[in-house]
A protein has these predicted regions:
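Intrinsically disordered, low-complexity sequence elements enriched in Ser/Thr/Gly/Pro
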Residues: 37, 196-198, 230, 252-255
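A cross-kingdom C-terminal cell-surface attachment/processing module
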Residues: 237-255
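Juxtamembrane/start-of-transmembrane alpha-helix segments at the extracytoplasmic/lumenal side
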Residues: 226-240
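Extracellular, repeat-based ectodomains that mediate carbohydrate processing or recognition
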Residues: 1-224
């Protein structure tokens, strides 16, 4: 599958999702550090050999892609990415020209959380809608992608681990769980450095309003009620994307069940 020139071997950070009719979508990080997809319409027996890049060319570094699908062609993908194109070719953490690999990212690279939607991912020329979701970086500098080669830069850069994920509920609403390494003064801009980007705070974004991944549901609206928790435990922000809004819940484990 996806054996065109842009595909690394072995693939990195791969993930597969299936829709309600068993069409399959395989995602991975390509050799140019973009997120790529290969599709199967026969339950994974055969795959198309030409992959599709689903992350914008402006995102020059990406890692940890995760995906879920609803009805045929309706998918959402999340990943960490950077648009710091000026850092390409500059010395990485090993002093070599940086090629966009997040594992070797220099200190002037910031990684944000992105989400990419498609409602026609099975079409010959599918349309993808992408938005940078997080208002501040998730990580600054390098992200350890090889547990045998992590670096101590103000603490281990393995702080994010690799436990990000994306799921949908019975209404087709998207939820994104991720580890946030840049919090406090790192997020506020007062000290946005790799050394201050070593948190591991669990956070969740979910779709506030926009199209469900189940066609019969139509457009989703925001929940009628906000979880009854102290303000200091929950920070909620509506962030625009082309046809939907995402909401962030910080410290989700503190949310009480009703």
């Amino acid at each position: 599958m996806g054996e065109d020139v842009g595909t690394p071997n072995p693939r990195k950070n791969g993930e597969v999702a299936t829709d309600t009719e068993s069409n399959a979508y395989n995602l991975w990080v390509g050799s140019d550090q973009g997120v790529y997809m290969s599709r199967s319409i026969d339950s994974g027996n055969t795959w198309e050999q030409t992959s599709i890049r689903i992350s914008p060319i402006e995102v020059i570094s990406s890692t940890f892609p995760h995906t879920s699908a609803g009805d045929p062609g309706r998918i959402a993908i999340t990943y960490l990415g950077s648009e710091n194109a000026s850092a390409l070719g500059q010395p990485n953490i090993d002093g070599e020209p940086w090629d966009g690999n997040a594992h070797y990212a220099p200190s002037n690279v910031s990684h944000y959380l992105y989400v990419t939607y498609s409602l026609n991912a099975l079409d010959p020329e599918p349309v993808f809608h992408t938005q940078r979701v997080s208002a501040d970086p998730v990580q600054v500098g390098s992200i350890c992608l090889n547990s045998g080669d992590c670096r101590d830069i103000g603490g281990s850069n393995r702080n994010l681990l690799d436990f990000n994920d994306l799921h949908i509920d019975l209404e087709g609403r998207v939820y994104i769980g991720f580890a946030d390494g840049c919090t406090g003064t790192c997020a506020s801009g007062n000290d946005t450095t790799p050394e201050n980007s070593r948190s591991r705070q669990g956070s969740v974004y979910y779709l506030g309003n926009g199209p469900s991944l189940y066609e019969s549901v139509g457009d989703l609206t925001e929940f009628n009620t906000v979880p009854e928790v102290p303000d200091k435990f929950v920070s909620i922000h509506l962030l625009p994307i082309p046809f939907a809004a995402m909401v962030v819940l910080s410290n989700p484990l503190r949310i009480r069940k009703k």
